[in-house]
Design a protein with these regions (language model features):
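Structural recognition of an alpha-helix C-terminal capping motif at a helix-to-coil junction
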Residues: 21, 35-42, 55-67
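Internal acidic/polar
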Residues: 71, 78-103, 129-130
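Hydrophobic positions on the alpha-helical face of helix-turn-helix-like DNA-binding modules
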Residues: 40, 64, 120-121, 133-134, ...
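A short, charge-rich alpha-helical start-of-domain segment used by transcription regulators
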Residues: 1-21, 34
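Sigma70-family region 2
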Residues: 2, 41-56, 75-76
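Arg/Lys-rich amphipathic alpha helix in sigma70-family domain 2
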Residues: 50-52, 63-83, 99, 150
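DNA-recognition helix of helix-turn-helix
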Residues: 70, 137-161
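Short amphipathic alpha helix immediately N-terminal
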Residues: 112-132, 136, 161
Length: 165
């Protein structure tokens, strides 16, 4: 293996799990999330020599993943694919084991958030440091903390609504 391949392997191992969760947060589908994960890391591989070290590499990869997910969602919307309906979401939720039901419900709630909120909360769930999230989001760290608080309140309301159904 040459140096680029070794570096890429380390980058993939360090970031793939978090990127998968990010992609899953956008799609709610394992297969689509895996496809987006592969597409993201293909772009990382193709552009690794263009990385300028002005930010953490994980920040750069998150940006690529977010853009890849957004492109995917726009394409899905244009193709008129079925949106997640309450019935489809319920079917998906039943596929999860009882242990994962709450996680599935949380992702369902996350999918109802605005795009910027989904990005932020997914990064928080992946335990990305706040300064890095602020950089990815393009907002100050103080503003980020306020947004996270509001997103958590919104998620709590959504979660409680769905739990009552």
């Amino acid at each position: 293996m040459d140096t680029k391949e070794l570096a890429f392997k380390k980058i993939f191992e360090a970031n793939s799990k978090k990127i998968f969760h990010l992609c899953y947060g956008y799609t709610g589908d394992d297969d689509a999330a895996n496809d987006l994960l592969q597409e993201t890391f293909l772009k990382v591989w193709q552009n690794l020599d263009k990385f300028r070290n002005q930010a953490l590499i994980s920040t750069w990869i998150y940006r690529i993943a977010v853009n890849t997910c957004l492109t995917y969602l726009r394409t899905e919307k244009r193709q008129g694919k079925e949106e997640i309906t309450p019935q489809l979401a319920e079917t998906k939720r039943e596929e999860f084991s009882e242990k994962n039901e709450q996680v599935a419900l949380l992702y369902k709630c996350i999918s109802k958030l605005e795009e910027s909120e989904r990005i932020i909360i997914t990064l928080v769930l992946d335990e990305v440091p706040y300064p890095e999230i602020a950089e990815v989001s393009g907002i100050s760290e103080g503003n980020l903390r306020v947004k996270i608080h509001r997103i958590k309140q919104k998620l709590t309301e959504l979660y409680n609504q769905y739990e009552r159904l």
